[in-house]
């Protein structure tokens, strides 16, 4: 684990609590992480994604954040993508094919994507090894009325045990 931490992230050691969190995720425990900004939360799901077979679905509320993380991961040699708005230029079926055959480790989507039954059906065909909700504090800070799609996340546990 430390070898992968050094190779991809450039750290020789974990920050406080990161190793225990990663171990919890690797043990297939549901894990809630609350750390301050800059505390290293993202690494807590990114590292297990590298250590496990398959890919991790990351649910993120902001397109710009998804794009930044995908760019950062790809620059580090970690294949990542995010599902863009369904359009003629980027049809969802093509994006799903990219996910299915592209050997990605991290795939990102907005909570609104989870409201689409076709998206969920196609997501079931992917070798998911975990689901992370990034920026989860936004749920309580922004309120359930601002992004009601966040409520759909609760059903993922049954669909992807």
Regions found by a protein language model. Name each.
Residues 28-47, 57-60:
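Walker A/P-loop
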Residues 129-133, 148-161:
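Conserved P-loop NTPase motor "coupling/switch" region that bridges the ATPase
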Residues 30, 54-57, 79, 102-107, ...:
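Loop/turn-to-beta-strand initiation segments
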Residues 1-36:
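Conserved pre-motif I regulatory segment
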Residues 3, 46, 154:
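Active-site phosphate/pyrophosphate- and oxyanion-stabilizing loops and adjacent acidic/basic residues
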Residues 39, 46, 87-130, 138-144, ...:
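Conserved helix/coil segment N-terminal to the catalytic DExD/H
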Residues 54-76, 81, 85-87, 91, ...:
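Conserved Walker A/P-loop ATP-binding site and its immediately adjacent core
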């Amino acid at each position: 684990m430390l070898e992968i931490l050094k190779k991809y992230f450039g750290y020789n050691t974990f920050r406080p609590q990161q190793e225990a969190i990663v171990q919890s995720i690797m043990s297939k425990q549901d894990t809630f992480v609350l750390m301050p900004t800059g505390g290293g939360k993202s690494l807590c799901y990114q590292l297990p994604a590298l250590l496990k077979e398959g890919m991790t679905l990351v649910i993120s509320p902001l397109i710009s954040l998804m794009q930044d993380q995908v760019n950062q991961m790809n620059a580090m040699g970690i294949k990542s993508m995010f599902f863009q708005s369904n359009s003629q230029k980027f049809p969802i079926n093509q994006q799903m094919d990219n996910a299915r055959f592209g050997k990605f480790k991290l795939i990102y989507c907005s909570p609104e994507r989870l409201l689409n039954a076709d998206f969920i059906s196609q997501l079931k065909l992917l070798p998911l090894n975990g689901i992370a909700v990034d920026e989860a504090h936004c749920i309580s800070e922004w309120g359930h009325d601002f992004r009601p799609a966040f409520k759909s996340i609760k059903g993922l546990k049954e669909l992807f045990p």
